[in-house]
Amino acid sequence: MSAASDDEFPCYLRAYFPCRIDYTKFILGEDSHDLRFTVTLDPVPRKNPLMVIYDGPTDDGDTLVTISKPKDHLGKLSTTIQVSDIATVLSNRFDDIHRLYKFSLKVGGSRREKFEWRPSEGKEVQEMFRHAKGYKLVRLKSVGPGAGKGGKRKDRQLDETSDGKEVVAVWATKKSLVPSNLRMDVKPFKFELRASGKSGELGSEFGYFALATALRIWSYKALGITGFRITD
C-alpha cells in the first residue's frame, strides 16, 4: 500500500470542499498547504464503493482505502473497509439507542482488538469546532490515561471515557438545527488521532481504518447516507 507523502499518517485532518454544495469529491489535509488525501463519494445505490481514499491532492493517486456501500440486513448496517489486503467490517444496529459503531482490527502484530465509536460532545470533540458534535473511538481492551478511573466529563482525564477506557481518535462536525437531508451546503469534518492511536502503538494501518470508519459515520450523520439496496 502506498503511504501518505511523508510516510507517516497525519494525526490531524480536516476536509476541504472545492464546492460548498458538492460532497462527492473533497480533499483531506492538516491545512490548505498540506493536502494529503482525496476522497470520492458515490451516494447512488449501485455496486461502486461508497468512498475511495486516494493518496495525494487528486484522485489520480494510488488507492489507499475503499469503503463499501453499507448493506442493510435485518436492521443491521454493515460496511466493509478495505486497506491494502486487510479488511474489517463496521457495524451498527438501527435499534441501538446508544448509536454505537463497532469494528475489530489486528494491532501490534497478530493481536485482534475491538473498537467502538461512541457519540460525544466531550472536550476532545469540542476542541475542534465551536458548537461541535461528533464521535470518539474507544479502545475497548484498554485502561485510559487517568488509570481507568473514568467518571463525569468535568472530572475525568482527557482521552479517557466515563468507564475508564482509552480514546484513540475523534471526529467532529458542527451542530445544526436543520436536518442533514434538508441542508444545501456540506457539513464540515475534522478528524484527530489521540493517545495510543497517535503514538503508533496500534500499527501503521490503524490511522487509515480509524479515518475510514469516521468518514462512514460522518456520511450518515452529516449527509444522511444510510443503507442501500444495491443494484447493477
Regions found by a protein language model. Give the residues of each.
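Low-complexity or membrane-interfacial segments used for flexible interactions
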Residues: 1-34, 109-232
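Extreme N-terminal segments of fungal proteins
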Residues: 1-83
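Beta-strand elements of modular eukaryotic interaction domains
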Residues: 15, 41-42, 90-93, 126-127
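Eukaryote-biased feature marking scaffold/signaling PDZ-domain proteins and nuclear chromatin regulators
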Residues: 21, 46-48, 76, 96-98, ...
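Ordered hydrophobic segments in well-structured contexts
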Residues: 38, 50-52, 102, 116, ...
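Predominantly extracellular/luminal cell-surface or secreted proteins
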Residues: 52-56, 106, 140
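Short beta-strand segments
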Residues: 63-66, 87-90, 113-115
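Extracellular-facing segments of soluble proteins and assemblies that are Gly/Ser/Thr-biased and enriched
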Residues: 71-107
